[in-house]
């Protein structure tokens, strides 16, 4: 999987940072996909500066209905139609997302020429496509807000073709059944159990993308053991009380959570517009003093999961 940050500013855009939007390129050889997490104003314009186009998007996950995470959605949906795109699109979000989209389209005389499904979610598993699952966790924020945990299912281990050959099993289409762990019958009457010739399963990757939040009960479960955790660091340590009063987190809180959850890497985003480049580097240093494996997301930064 690959993360592409389209917007990394909190609340309002700056000259160098747009408001929140993150692309997740699933990069699967047989079932690829492009997912968008949040869609702040100007997201479709940010998308033009990448190698991707709106037609590749098949799922959008909205964390909450504050404008800096949502106001880019109507324009993106309409531009998708105006470009002649007919591929289906599914939007997941909290209660109210359906009313927002339908109202924006209705009062502007707009529509979509592709199948559009809107799923209003609650906490819990919201998607399992056979390769990966997505679970929503409630955040601590003035509006109903969710963070998303994306977990790939474990991949089957490699089939040991050499061991099968040594056992007198010639290569054949039956290898696909063996790779699936099934038992086959050979012409000589022998039964071969595929599970006996498979390497250990390859653990799937796990990713946590937090919505806006102050410290909350669900945070540790959302982040526990993930390879990559994406979390806001809206304000520095000295402004922690102010951040929390508005349903946001400080650098210290993001980094401490990453350490306690045992994540592989922390990526901080959603930084206040009060910070210039020098200030953002200060935020990064504060996080790294607690959790060294921290990176700062800038617009168009790409991270592998």
Curated annotation (Swiss-Prot):
Its EC number is 3.1.-.-. Zn(2+) 2 binds at residues 68-69, 212, 270. Binds 2 Zn(2+) ions. Pfam families: Lactamase_B_2 (PF12706). It is an enzyme of class 3 (hydrolase). InterPro entries: Metallo-B-lactamas, RibonucZ/Hydroxyglut_hydro, Rnase_BN, RNase_Z/BN. Zn(2+) 1 binds at residues 64, 66, 141, 212. Its cofactor is Zn(2+). Keywords: Endonuclease, Exonuclease, Hydrolase, Metal-binding, Nuclease, tRNA processing, Zinc. GO terms for molecular function: 3'-tRNA processing endoribonuclease activity; exonuclease activity; zinc ion binding. The active site is at residue 68. Belongs to the RNase Z family. RNase BN subfamily. Zinc phosphodiesterase, which has both exoribonuclease and endoribonuclease activities. HAMAP family: RNase_Z_BN (MF_01818). Homodimer. This is Ribonuclease BN. The lineage of its organism: Bacteria, Pseudomonadati, Pseudomonadota, Gammaproteobacteria, Enterobacterales. The gene is rbn.
């Amino acid at each position: 999987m690959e993360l592409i940050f389209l917007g990394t500013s909190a609340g309002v855009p700056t000259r160098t940072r747009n408001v929140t939007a993150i692309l997740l390129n699933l990069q699967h050889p047989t079932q690829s996909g492009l997912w968008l997490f949040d869609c702040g104003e100007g997201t479709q314009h940010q998308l033009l500066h990448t190698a991707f186009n709106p037609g590749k998007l098949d799922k959008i996950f909205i964390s909450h209905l504050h404008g800096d995470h949502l106001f880019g959605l109507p324009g993106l949906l309409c531009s998708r139609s105006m470009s002649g795109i007919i591929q289906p699109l599914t939007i997941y979000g909290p209660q109210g997302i359906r009313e927002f989209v339908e109202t924006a389209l209705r009062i502007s005389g707009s529509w979509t020429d592709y199948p559009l499904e809107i799923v209003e979610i609650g906490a819990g598993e919201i998607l399992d496509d056979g390769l990966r699952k997505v679970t929503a966790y409630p955040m601590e924020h003035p509006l109903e807000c969710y963070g998303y945990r994306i977990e790939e299912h474990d991949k089957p281990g490699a089939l040991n073709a050499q061991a099968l050959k040594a056992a007198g099993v010639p290569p054949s289409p039956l290898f696909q059944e063996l790779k699936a762990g099934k038992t086959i019958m050979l012409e000589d009457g022998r039964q071969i159990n595929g599970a006996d010739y498979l390497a250990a399963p390859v653990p799937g990757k796990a990713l946590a993308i937090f919505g806006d939040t102050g410290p909350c009960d669900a945070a540790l479960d959302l982040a526990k053991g993930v390879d990559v955790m994406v979390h806001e660091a809206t304000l520095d340590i000295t402004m922690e009380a102010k951040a929390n009063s508005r349903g946001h987190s400080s650098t210290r809180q993001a980094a401490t959570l990453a350490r306690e959850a045992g994540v592989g890497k922390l990526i901080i985003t959603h930084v206040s517009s009060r910070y210039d480049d020098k200030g953002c580097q200060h935020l990064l240093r504060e996080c790294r003093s607690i959790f060294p494996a921290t990176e700062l997301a800038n617009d168009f930064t790409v991270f592998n999961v």
